[in-house]
Structures are given as C-alpha cells and as structure tokens.
C-alpha cells in the first residue's frame, strides 16, 4: 500500500499505536519522513533539514505550555477524588467500629453514648466522602481543564491517558466501597430498631421494665432516627455519582467517498458533530479520531491500522490520498472527550475506483463488404482492469452506431451497415471508474451493391379495389436486401408506390384501387440507399362493381289541376361498365310502392298523377351488368286541392261489330259550379300495374263520355272529377323545384298541361 496520507487539521498520528504526532495545519507525511519527523521533534535530527517539522515543534511547544495549567488542575481534582475516597474509607471504618461497639453494648460491655457517637460520626464521614467522590467523578467525567494534558513535551507528543485512567480506576473503587458501607449502615440501623422497640412500632406492648428505661429508649430512638436521615442522604448522593466515565455520542452522518485521479486513489470522509440533548457537542475538549486500515472486500483488516486525531472540533472532514486503485479500505470515525473517553464508531468499508484507461492504439482496417467491415487495435498503455471496449461508427450524415464488446477482444466486425457508405470509426476503453478518450479516427467505406430483379412476379387474387401480388426473391448477391418496392400505374404517366420493409416478405396486397380498372405492376428489391433492378411488368384488372348513385338530381311539381312530379339527373360518376337501366321506386308514404324502369339514354322522368296534400317518397337507382347501385332518395309533399264530388258515376262496357271495345261513362250534376270534368282510367291487373290516362272535358254541363280501349277482356278503373279553372291563367301552374347537396339545379321547363 502506498503511504501518502493527508488529514485536515491533523493533531495526532498513531501508526500502529507507536507514538503521536501533533500539528495545527495540513500535514503530509510519506514513508521514512514519519520517523525523520519524530527524530526532529525529539531533537535527534537537525530542524534545518525539516523546516516543516521545525514549525510543528514550535507550535507543539506553545501548546504544551498552555497544557501545564490543565495538568495542574487535573492533579487537584485527582487529589480531591483521592481525599473523598479516603474520607469514605474512614467513614466506613467508623461505621464498622460503631457496629462492633454496638454489639458489645448490647452485651453490656460498652457505654451507649460511645456507641451512638461512633455510629453518627462514621455516617457523617461516609456522607462527606461521597460528596468528595462525586466532585472527583464529575471532574473526571467532563474535565474542562484537565483534558489538555501534556501533548507536546520537549518537542515530542506523549500519551496523556495513563494518569486519567488511574484516577478513574481509583474513583470507581471508592464508589464501590462507599456503596457497601451505606448498605451495611442501613442493615445495622434496622437490626438495632428491632432490638429496642418503641411506642411508634406496631404490636408494641408496654411493660414495667420498658417504662423503667423510658429515657434511655427515647435516646436510642432519637439516635436511630438521625442515622436513618443521614442514610437517606447517602442514598441520594450515591444515585448522583456516576459508575464510571461516560463516553460522548458517536459522530453523525458519516460519509465516505473515493476517487482515482492520475493513477492514484483518494478517500474522503466527512461527518456531523455528535449531539447531546439536541445540541452539537463542541469545544476545546472535543476531538475526533479517524481509524484507517487496508482491508478485504468483507471489511477484514489486511494491514496495519493508522489512527489520526483531529484536534479542532470545528473540522469534520478528512482525506487519505495516494492510495492504490481498485483496493478495499476500512474507515471509522470516533469522538473523544479529554483523550480518555471515546465514543463508539461503525466501520465503513470503501473500495477505491480503478484507473481511467488511456485511449486504445493503432486502430486499423482489416476488411470490407457491402454491409460490414472489420477493424483491429492495440490495448491502451494505461488500462487498470478493463470492463469493455466501445466502438463508434458514424456515417457522413452524422448518424452514429455504437457497439460495446468484451475487453478481451482486440478486433471486431461490424455488420448491418449501409452499402457504399463512408464511416468514421473510433474506439474507447472503459473501467469501472470511467471511459478513456476515444482513439484516433479511422475512415472506412463499405462496398457498393445493386440487388438483382425479383423473379416470377404474379397476381394471385383481386377484387373490386385491390390486387394481391406474389414473387420470388432475387438471386443472392454480396449485399443485404432490406425490403421491396412495388410501383403501379394506370397509364404510365404517373405511378404510386408501396414499400415493404421486411425482406422475408414476398407477397403484398395493393389496396384503394378503382373497380373494373386495368393496372400495371413492377416489383423492385431495395437496399438502404438504392433500388435494384426492376421485375417484368404485369397487368391486372380489378373486378367490376355496381354503379354509384346518379348525380345532379333535380325534381319539381307540375300542377294543371292534377299534380305530377318531374325528375332529371346525370349518370353516376362510376358506372363500372354500361348502364342497363335507371329504376325509380315511388309512392305515397305508408302506402304501396310503384317501380318503374327507364331507358339508360333518357335522363328525365315524369310521374303519374299524385294524391293531393300527401307525402310521396322517391328513390332513383342506376343498374349495370353487376347489379343495382346505391340510390338517390328524396321526398315531395303535394299541394292541398278542393274536392268536387261528381255523383252517380256509371260505366258500361260495349263491343262493336268491328270488335272495338269502349267504355261509356255517365255521371250526374255536381252540387257546385264547375268549369269541366276529368275522366281518369287505367287497367286494373294489380296495384299500380298501369299509369292513369285521362280525358279533359271543358264543359260544365257535360254528363258523359266514351273511352275506347284496346284490350277487350281487361278490367279498368274509372274516376270522374270536376274542376274549376283559376281566374288568372298565368298563375295556373304551381311548381316546386328541389336539388341535393353537390348537385346542380336544372332549369324549369314549360308546363305541357296548360
């Protein structure tokens, strides 16, 4: 172990308990200088050779002068303690003598006055000795002046513990004897009371003989009471007497740290003062001792112990320098009062950090591939115990790759790199104390690589909006394939792309395509930086779908006495092939629904006659070979109309010689004036199986008409209605026009019924 030791305000140094060295400032001692400094202090070595030691001699002499007074005071306290012990012994002897005489007195050989006088005098002597012993004990427990015994005498510091320990031992012996005397006295008083009962004692029976010695018994009782009082005082004094020296509490919050700088390790220890009754213990009598020794990892000492004493209680830190790196040491801090009384302390084991390595040497390139290279190096000259190497590979873009490897290795290959890319390589070594500087940089460029084309590209599935492709991987090359890219287009003027990041995946589904549309596909293998050669083109057509809804739907109500609706529209945005039909579903809300098919080339439709003052629902569909698409839905409410009832309507079917079938319709006179009549008729083969046809008769007095029909055996439905024209023909038409969000409103057409 190296022996550089630095302690702030070092007062005493005990290498293996072979002496003391005192100073008042920073002390640095190494190896043989310890013995040389000791010789200088003893006067055997010239002080001129050791100027620092000479300064310490002068300081030690000055402090020794101040300490002589403390020695004298300590001697006086010691004498007081000894005197107290002697008095206590005398009191004990007096008690013992009184007890002997008391025994003789009880036998009638000693006068009673002398017996009680010996007892009282012995008790008072013990009490006085106890008071002296207490003063001596307190002086030895916390000696304010006697603490500074001669630390520096004629240039050398001598131990000042033997005198104090002797005093404490003597005091402890005296206190033990004192306790025995008090117990003996109390026992003797109790026995004497039992011999001479008094009226104050329970179960006492008076007798003539007792009354004969009344004066004597009162005298005995009074003296026994006096001895009891003195004994109780002795007990009180004995409680306050300490049984021995009381150590101070240990230092608080002891912290030990270590570092290694420039191939040398240091240990730093700090602490807080001990506390007594909530206050820190300080003062000139409070010192600290730091115990330091090399140890193993379990805290067991493996070398000699060094003890350092810090005289100034205001300094609560110390350092031990120039130690071996990566080594274990034990540190313990204790507080001392008056040099002889020392607190308990807990030993702390600390391991000094290892050396910080120097940079690795001779970094060089061993070989390259498109996605890898290998490097080698020499270990650092200063390395201690290495924990790992760290290799840094930085691209031109600044992106860095870091790899940590085993410290036993001196070469390594980095993989998964970009092809055709320059990297800057550095390496650093680490111990458990930190990382070395990085080595000199080495520039390395990986080989270039272009992948071959994927093989056997094919479409394995499709639907309305997607196509699924599959292919075989390219033939192996020197580099790594990172994934694939699929380009697809409609007309080669522009293309979309799909990326696959996993090179093991050789199938993909391209989505969000248009139904019934031809697409062209090409697959590429790719690296991190470039595409490889493209595969052959393949074409695939998505499946057809039903058309989307018709666009720009416009509708309006037409009214010439009978209300209708007219609807117009534009073809769907996506027809997915030719439109076969347009289909309209319509009817009174809550009633039967009619279905009409329209030719794909006519983009308008006029409804049959509508019910007055009723809601009608409409749905318009487009249809192709796949099926019927989504509808456009809308609703219309017709206007209210006055109802003119025509009574007695009769229908008669007649067939002429030429096989012409006609319906003769007659009716009665309405109750209100009319301008004419409407006669409506249609075939009745089911609900809404045919459209209404009508005849307008603009004669208010007409009472019948004839309708020619083409189908002889088909039933017909006939309705007769009266109507009254409006006074202003220009307002005869009432129309409503509607459109839908995103659709254009068509222009209003003229009313064909006016």
Curated annotation (Swiss-Prot):
Region annotation Disordered: where it falls in the sequence: 40-61, 85-106, 130-163, 731-754
Signal sequence, start to end: 1-19
Location in or out of the cell: Secreted
InterPro entries: ECM_Regulatory_Proteins, FN3_dom, FN3_sf, Ig-like_fold
SUPFAM superfamilies xref list: Fibronectin type III
Keywords (A to Z) from UniProt: Repeat, Secreted, Signal
Tissues showing expression: Prismatic layer of shell (at protein level). Expressed primarily in the mantle with highest level in the outer epithelium of the mantle edge and lower level in the mantle pallium.
Low complexity composition bias: residue spans: 130-161
GO cellular component, as recorded: extracellular region
Ranges of residues in domain Fibronectin type-III: 250-355, 359-449, 453-545, 549-642, 645-742
Chief location bin: secreted
Pfam families (alphabetical): fn3
PANTHER family listed in its UniProt record: FIBRONECTIN TYPE-III DOMAIN-CONTAINING PROTEIN, TENASCIN
Record protein name field: Fibronectin type III domain-containing protein 1
Organism: Margaritifera margaritifera
